[in-house]
């Protein structure tokens, strides 16, 4: 058994205890609901108010059960994330409720400004001297619909749901480079370029402040690495080099760092969980952000 699996044994024990309490309270709520519905049928004359009064009791147990699920997220998941992160990175900070700020994403010009923004699972740290920030983000746009009778409804459909990475390296560059599968939201002042790779041109659109800067980063090997990274993710992917930063947006409709409350925290669960974390150093290693080029 690995050292990490030994460390998570107490967390799995806590999970079992919390889930037992969760299941117990949910069972009580279900049984009480069945009894109340049965009484309602028997005493139909008392009607709605009879049911409403007694439904307060099973609702109480449902809320109590939910409190155990919330405690799992606030304590066990938090401890588990810190265990994994501290094992892989330096200067680690994690906050389940925090995210990369909307303004940071807006200023890249890669995606349109959202009407509603949310995020979670913010991670900050360093790996081999490269600092990084990453979080889940969800971007929504406001849409109005008017039917044939003039009734207006407003919805906020999601157009970006996934992960946003920000890597910072010692060297500051003067140019700007955007690599996207579709045209970026803002390409003002940038030149559209093609590479000698047909496979790369077919997959990505390339915009840069100047040609020399673009191909300083986009060597043939680097283009291969970007294509490999694209294959690692479902959905679309965005790259943005500016100053001493690299932004990567992954729009894959996925929630990262999820640990199921109902399932054991075992080797299989940890493999999937660590896979989400390992994407962070994989990008640093694959794009060689630790090389002299970025120092």
PLM segments and residue spans:
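Residue-level signal for alpha-helical transmembrane segments in multi-pass membrane proteins
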Residues: 38-43, 60-64
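Transmembrane alpha-helical segments and their cytosolic interface motifs
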Residues: 20-36
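Flexible coil/linker segments and helix-coil junctions enriched in charged and small residues
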Residues: 37, 44-48, 146-155
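Transmembrane-cytosolic junction motif
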Residues: 19-22, 59-83
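Juxtamembrane membrane-interface segments of multi-pass membrane proteins
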Residues: 1-9, 73-93
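Cytosolic juxtamembrane N-terminal segments of multi-pass membrane proteins
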Residues: 1-23
């Amino acid at each position: 058994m690995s050292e990490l699996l030994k460390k998570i044994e107490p967390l799995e024990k806590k999970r079992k205890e919390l889930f037992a309490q969760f299941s117990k309270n949910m069972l009580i709520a279900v049984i009480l609901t069945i009894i109340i519905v049965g009484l309602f049928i028997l005493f139909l004359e008392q009607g709605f108010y009879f049911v409403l009064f007694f439904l307060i009791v099973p609702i109480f147990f449902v809320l109590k059960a939910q409190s155990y699920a919330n405690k799992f997220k606030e304590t066990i998941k938090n401890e588990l994330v810190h265990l994994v992160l501290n094992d892989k990175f330096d200067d680690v900070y994690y906050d389940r409720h925090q995210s990369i700020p909307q303004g940071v994403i807006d200023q890249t010009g890669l995606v349109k400004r959202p009407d509603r923004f949310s995020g979670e699972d913010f991670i900050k740290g360093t790996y081999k001297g490269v600092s990084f920030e990453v979080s889940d983000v969800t971007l929504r746009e406001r849409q109005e619909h008017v039917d044939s009778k003039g009734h207006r409804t407003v919805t906020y459909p999601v157009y970006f749901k996934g992960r946003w990475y920000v890597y910072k390296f010692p060297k500051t560059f003067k140019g700007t480079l955007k690599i996207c599968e579709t045209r970026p939201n803002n390409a003002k002042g940038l030149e559209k370029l093609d590479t000698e790779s047909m496979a790369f041109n077919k997959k990505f659109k390339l915009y840069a402040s100047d040609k020399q800067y673009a191909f300083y980063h986009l060597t043939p090997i680097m283009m291969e690495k970007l294509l490999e990274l694209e294959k690692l993710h479902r959905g679309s992917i965005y790259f943005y080099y500016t100053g001493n930063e690299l932004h990567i947006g992954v729009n894959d409709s996925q929630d990262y760092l999820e640990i199921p409350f109902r399932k054991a925290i075992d080797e299989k669960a940890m493999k999937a969980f660590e896979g989400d974390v390992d994407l962070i150093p994989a990008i640093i290693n694959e794009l060689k952000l630790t090389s002299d080029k970025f120092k």
